[in-house]
UniProtKB/Swiss-Prot annotation:
InterPro entries: 2-oxoA_DH_lipoyl-BS, Biotin_lipoyl, GCV_H, GCV_H/Fam206, GCV_H_sub, Single_hybrid_motif
Family: Belongs to the GcvH family.
Known function: The glycine cleavage system catalyzes the degradation of glycine. The H protein (GCSH) shuttles the methylamine group of glycine from the P protein (GLDC) to the T protein (GCST). Has a pivotal role in the lipoylation of enzymes involved in cellular energetics such as the mitochondrial dihydrolipoyllysine-residue acetyltransferase component of pyruvate dehydrogenase complex (DLAT), and the mitochondrial dihydrolipoyllysine-residue succinyltransferase component of 2-oxoglutarate dehydrogenase complex (DLST).
Recorded superkingdom: Eukaryota
Names of required cofactors: (R)-lipoate
Pfam families named among the record's database cross-references: GCV_H
Every Lipoyl-binding domain range: 66-148
Organism listed in the record: Bos taurus
GO CC list: glycine cleavage complex; mitochondrion
BP-aspect Gene Ontology terms: glycine decarboxylation via glycine cleavage system
Compartments (UniProt record): Mitochondrion
The protein's name: Glycine cleavage system H protein, mitochondrial
Subunit note: Interacts with GLDC. The glycine cleavage system is composed of four proteins: P (GLDC), T (GCST), L (DLD) and H (GCSH).
């Protein structure tokens, strides 16, 4: 549901147009805009960090060469209430799809896999005291690790939100 809401907001924002109503006679302006002109507002990669997903239900967003990694809403719902997070130490080097930790819940335990190759630069210390953040806010406060990535082209191999939603539907059938 959260993914649908994000997509709806992005669709709405992408189509916004600003229209100014003339309050005085429309006189030519030196830069070519006139009162009543239509200007489109655009959002792009510079403004929105795109969330990418793996088939194992991890996600990653990137900003300034650092990736933030977490698990998807689908994964946290399947796990149930998370009661313990096992995360790597800062400085750990990871390869794409390498196991880097685990989440334990009241229902099951699940391994975590790195979406990219790189080095862990930070772990979410709040999860030690409150592992339930993974359930309450899997895309914001419940992130797991931050990492530099050594091969940016690996991002292209991950699924977009739309592709991930289709993937989820295909495995639920």
């Amino acid at each position: 549901m959260a993914l649908r809401a994000v997509r709806s907001v992005r669709a709405a924002v992408g189509g916004l147009r600003a229209i100014s109503a003339p309050s005085a006679p429309c006189l030519p302006r030196p830069w070519g805009l006139r009162a009543g002109a239509v200007r489109e507002l655009r959002t792009g990669p510079a403004l929105l960090s795109v969330r990418k997903f793996t088939e194992k239900h991890e996600w990653v967003t990137t900003e300034n060469g650092v990736g933030t990694v977490g698990i998807s809403n689908f994964a946290q719902e399947a796990l149930g209430d998370v009661v313990y997070c096992s995360l790597p130490e800062v400085g750990t080097k990871l390869n794409k799809q390498e196991e880097f930790g685990a989440l334990e819940s009241v229902k099951a335990a699940s391994e975590l896999y790195s979406p990219l190759s790189g080095e862990v630069t930070e772990i979410n210390k709040a999860l030690a005291e409150n592992p339930g953040l993974v359930n309450k806010s899997c895309y914001e406060d419940g992130w797991l690790i931050k990492m530099t990535f050594s091969n940016p082209s690996e991002l292209d191999e991950l699924m977009s939100e739309e592709a991930y939603e289709k993937y989820i539907k295909s495995i639920e059938e």
